[in-house]
């Protein structure tokens, strides 16, 4: 963890903090490259290969979600606003030792993410439930991934419509519909389980 070594908040709160300071620190560079510009090329590949929360959740036994996707994705917007308001309030109230608070927010925030993620995975029997419904970072990733250069597409000449791709997808993406307009087209994490 670079954040622990550098004592810097690498989560979304750290991005807001350094952005408001006008500082080009590791968190702002990380978000700019991996989560704002990166999805234009790799979609949500970050989620499938580099996200530390997703990596821990993938160790759980619920790799193939059994249930349909719930309609509670609005929670990610609430989490996004909470992270933004948390940092704004630190500036408004001129909190002392803000660097120390941001570092502890990084540690505590990660623990909370893991606890919520593991609890949701067990409750919904779905490793990636946190990613689908709670993760505020997807607010950055989803719009850019809509225009992603790298996409998994269905070869309709070989497809026999067995739906194995859908049944193996941890994000419930319907790969039969490979148009950019598919409802869940920005959800693909390029895990390649469908291939």
Predicted regions and their residues:
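Structured cytosolic domains appended to multi-pass membrane proteins
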Residues: 175-195
